[in-house]
Amino acid sequence: MHAKLKSAFQRLRAHPLVQVLANNPGNPRTLVLIEPLWGIPYNLLAPFTTLYMYAQGITDVQIGLILSITMVVQVFFSFFGGILSDKLGRKFTTMLGDFLGWATACLVWAVSNNFWLFLLAAVLNCFEQINQTAWYCLLIEDAQPKDLVNIYTWVNIGGLVAIFFAPLSGLFVSAYSVVPVVRVLYFLFSLTMVAKTLITFKFCRETRQGQIRRAETRQASVFHMLGEYRQLIPRLLQDKAVLKAVAVSVILYIANMVSTTFFSLYVTQRLGLSENYLAFFPILNAAVMLVFMVGIQHRLHAASFRTPLWIGLALYAIAVMVLLLSPAGSLGLVLLYVFVSAMAAALVNPRKDALLQLSLNAEERARLNALIMASTIALSSPFGYLTGWLSSLDRRLPFVFNLVLFLAAMLVIGRIQEPPAEHAEA
């Protein structure tokens, strides 16, 4: 028995996902390990956020309007995210975004009961865009490029493990109804994000590139740095590899926004399933993704991006067709939709993020990420209102729209080139 345990422990230590944490101490390991402080409360809330608004009289069109308004605000914050990441450092900017964008916003969500408070909370949450750029830089800038897919896999795993807490929210909703349970969860979310901010302060350090950029921009004004985007934009538009990676990111950003916002309404209002099931769908999704990421992901050659991405997008399209063809009350087909979507996400999510980062100039990563993020949100912003309007006409239409998006992404993926071997090979 002792020999078997020792052998199992040795195999665990030799697993590529364990090795990537051992080879990348400091920021990557710290940020991966504290990600559940965001992931647990977020996934407890995720199935019920739209219903929380709907139960308090917020209409489909108002939900879509909130999405579109906040996307416009997110564009503004995204532009400044790159500048603040350079001037204040990746670490401090990450902390700033976590505190204002999550800890503060969640307190407002906890007391929201009308359109204006929900809009205020959503706008406050836009501060989170400031730290998106900084967080990605803090995570990967001191990491080895060949480890990026596995690092992003760990980020996904951190969120997936948190999903197994989701049944608790389902049980409480069944006992006490949506509104009071979600209010308490938002308050707890605020507390965990305060803790995450403090841990980041204690255990993370500024990256080497962050120190260089902070020194280079110390004397530069914010407005001067904004003006420098005029030189970055033409360079970005001339880089076909980056443009293709950005196109895929934009398409998937919109598709994720649509499915996250309207799935709960679709299965409860159109298919007639109980809202108590909403907490269990993410568990199936997480279980499938975890099995895939831990047991299969590392067996796929790290240098291969195009084929896994294309297969993942095809699976997304198949999943949407299953959902659209599901008759009322068909729990089994909804579970099949979740299962296939999870396989698709496990293939797509780590690779699309790693592909984009490997395409960027490391010296300008912060501002390029900020520019790309702002562009992604700007291009996506009209679709919040559009899909809200489509849902008000027929709750199937947002998912028909998603099907078109996945087919378009497959066309783009067919034209990308693999990243350089020295960056991707394990």
What are these language model-derived features?
Residues 92-107, 307-322:
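Structural signature of the two symmetry-related core transmembrane helices
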